[in-house]
């Protein structure tokens, strides 16, 4: 994968997160902001989830209250380089915990 392909895929990931939050009808308020290629989800309790791209490594990084995760693209899924879990699994787990209610991005 070259840098432009990586950015195209990361942009698509960011857009999917934004679209799914826009259509989410949960009770909690989750704000989504993109600044300089970094996507920040802010929760009512003041906690945040930070998602950013690491261009030199062609990785997506996820920072949550539970810890930090690095994802490599394998096929058509972003997979954690430590646990083997998908990006969506770990994002949903963290968002659910931080929102205090079930959050789904799929």
UniProtKB/Swiss-Prot annotation:
Involved in iron-sulfur (Fe-S) cluster assembly. May act as a regulator of Fe-S biogenesis. One of its GO terms (biological process) is iron-sulfur cluster assembly. The keyword Transmembrane helix does not apply. It comes from Salmonella paratyphi B (strain ATCC BAA-1250 / SPB7). Belongs to the frataxin family. One of its GO terms (cellular component) is cytosol. This is Iron-sulfur cluster assembly protein CyaY. Pfam families: Frataxin_Cyay (PF01491).
């Amino acid at each position: 994968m070259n840098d432009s392909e990586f950015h195209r895929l990361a942009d698509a990931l960011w857009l999917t997160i934004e679209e799914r939050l826009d259509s989410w009808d949960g009770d909690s308020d989750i704000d989504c902001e993109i600044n300089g290629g970094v996507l920040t989800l802010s929760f009512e309790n003041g906690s945040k989830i930070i998602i950013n791209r690491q261009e030199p490594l062609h990785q997506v990084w996820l920072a949550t209250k539970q810890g930090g995760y690095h994802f490599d693209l394998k096929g058509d899924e972003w997979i954690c380089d430590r646990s083997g879990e998908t990006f969506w699994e770990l994002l949903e787990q963290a968002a659910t915990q931080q929102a205090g209610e079930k959050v789904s991005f799929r």
